[in-house]
Amino acid sequence: MVREFELSVAAVHRIVKKAGAERVSESAASELARILEEVGVDIAREALYFTLHAGRKTVRAKDVKAAYEKLFKFKRPYWFES
């Protein structure tokens, strides 16, 4: 069964290669695409919560950042540029 992802498998291949891999199997790229999509939906869902709580209809970058930090309990280092 071939599954369509929001992220292309080719893009995921490039991401894994950026991480230093010389070669990436199709199944590894597909699995990472599935996981990234799942994590992305979780972040988007949490960002929507922040948006609605603020009385807005538009999800903003600050909502996504806050959702990411809440879900992953990670504060970006001061040198991280957004």
Task: Give the positions of each predicted feature.
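Histone-fold and other basic nucleic-acid-binding segments
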Residues: 1-82
